[in-house]
Amino acid sequence: MREKIVVFGGNGFFGQRFVRLASEQGFQVISVSRRGAPQPTEAWHRAVEWVKGDVFSPEDWRLLFENATAVVDCIGIIHQNPSTNQTYQRFNVEIARILVTEARKQQVPIFVYLSAKPFVPFLLKAYFESKKRAEAIIMDVYPNPLIIRPSLFVGKERRGTRAVAQLTKFAHALGLLKKFQPQPVETAARMVLDEMIQKMKTKEVG
């Protein structure tokens, strides 16, 4: 029987890479999001079960946690807009609280949280603080979660991130921002998947 993982944020920039790699590794992958399957449709999408659901309404998706080996939270926003209720507290903290609470109720062995490395804390202080609050909540519920802290993701689909990568190289040449190392999104997704698989093998569950 294949291991089942339930992913939130699976049709995002990072999430699509992650669910694709996980399905290629033989996992039963379920992605929950408001939109369901990404558009336009690609061949690999057939290997993933795309479920429409509101993350703020657990009744939409909690039954999916039955017999799951892992729940993966890769939802998050780096820029907030309080006028539309898109705040760090709501999307980076409250969603983590909802998911980890439901995962614990269903006794899901592994909880994976995509946090963030504070690469430019002086510019995004509130963002990184929200990620830390989410981590604290998760660790209070799951004594041994898998928390990943990547740097900024870059990829060819997002032109803005490519520009950031080029500017970073220039800054490094000048001896600036040495701690800031943008990470290819494909590399990051593979790293998270590898760490999750290792956790499954060693049975270091929450």
Where are these regions (language model features)?
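Short, polar loop motifs at secondary-structure junctions
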Residues: 32-39
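Structural motif
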Residues: 4, 69-70, 110
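Oxidoreductase cofactor-interface core, primarily capturing Rossmann-like NAD(P)-dependent enzymes
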Residues: 11, 25, 121-206
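NAD(P)H-binding glycine-rich loop region in Rossmannoid oxidoreductase-like domains
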Residues: 38, 44-98, 102-105
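N-terminal Rossmann NAD(P)H-binding glycine-rich loop of SDR-like oxidoreductase domains
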Residues: 4-25
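Cofactor-binding loop segments of dinucleotide-utilizing enzymes, especially the Rossmann-like FAD-
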Residues: 10, 34, 116, 155
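Short glycine-rich anion-binding loops that position phosphate/pyrophosphate groups of nucleotides
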Residues: 77-78, 118, 153
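Conserved Rossmann-fold NAD(P)-dependent oxidoreductase catalytic core, especially the SDR/UDP-sugar
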Residues: 28, 85, 90-135, 141, ...
